[in-house]
A protein has these predicted regions:
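Non-catalytic C-terminal accessory region of glycerolipid acyltransferases
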Residues: 2-6, 71, 75, 86-203
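Residues that cap or initiate secondary-structure elements
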Residues: 16-18, 35, 60, 110, ...
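Short amphipathic alpha-helical segments, especially helix-boundary/capping motifs
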Residues: 15-16, 39-43, 65-69, 94-98, ...
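Short amphipathic alpha-helical segments and helix-helix/interface helices
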Residues: 17-21, 66, 120-121
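Catalytic core of membrane glycerolipid acyltransferases/transacylases, capturing the structured
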Residues: 25-83, 143
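Conserved beta-strand termini and adjacent loop/short-helix elements that scaffold enzyme active sites
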Residues: 11-15, 57, 79-82, 164-166, ...
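A short, well-structured juxtamembrane/interface segment
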Residues: 2-26, 38-39, 44
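Polar/charged alpha-helical tracts
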Residues: 15, 19, 44, 48, ...
Length: 203
């Protein structure tokens, strides 16, 4: 799994690279559920290996994601962005206060795909933690027949990475922040494969 991720050729603009790396403080990495495959490489390449904990569904459906993150060298907190339980919220707060990053998929764990749930901002608003919104456009990838059409970029293919930094001061109004962040995530995540790529939704 690690070798697969490291074979990918990430491309980014200087502006996006600055957004990825400008914060020495803990951040919440926010990306759509179908781009989770990239999460470990994002942490390794752009967050200087800072420990990161991913929020994963407490249901049986989240078991495979926990296994994936374990193989990728990341830890998990069981819960969901739609119904963030007290134990999961407390655990994420502790992770941030220990100086580590957290990862959140605002449309997880069961969708609908690209539906930003306000619960995703509970912990970041409470701890005044900035966000890193992640975008990815794949040159060549497979897609699974899952609710989110999960992307599996082909080994050695190019991935065009985007990033937007959202300071904690912009999260105070929950409804306004949810709408603005959702719009930005849609903007930096075009749902298309490059013309030279091959999309196989039948996997």
């Amino acid at each position: 799994m690690k070798l697969w991720g490291r074979s990918l050729r990430f491309e980014t603009t200087p502006e996006d690279l600055r957004a990825f790396t400008k914060n020495d403080e803990p951040v919440a990495i926010v990306l759509w559920h179908n781009r989770l495959f990239l999460s470990a490489e994002i942490v390794r390449r752009y967050r200087q290996g800072r420990p990161a904990h991913a929020l994963v569904s407490a249901s049986q459906d989240g078991a495979w994601l926990s296994a994936f993150f374990s193989l990728a060298g990341m830890r998990t907190v069981r819960g969901s962005s739609s119904r963030l339980g007290r134990e999961a919220a407390t655990a994420l707060v502790e992770v941030l206060r220990a100086g580590n990053d957290i990862g959140i998929t605002p449309d997880g764990p069961r969708g609908p795909c690209y539906d930003f749930k306000p619960g995703a901002l509970i912990v970041t608003r409470r701890t005044r933690t900035p966000l890193l919104l992640i975008g990815a456009e794949f040159e060549s990838a497979w897609q699974l027949r899952s609710w989110d059409r999960f992307y599996l970029p082909k080994p050695f293919s190019r991935v065009r990475m985007r990033c937007r930094h959202v300071p904690a001061t912009e999260l105070q109004d929950r409804d306004a922040a949810t709408a603005a962040i959702s719009a930005q995530l849609h903007e930096i995540n075009p749902d298309r494969i490059s013309a030279v790529g091959l999309n196989k939704p039948g996997l």
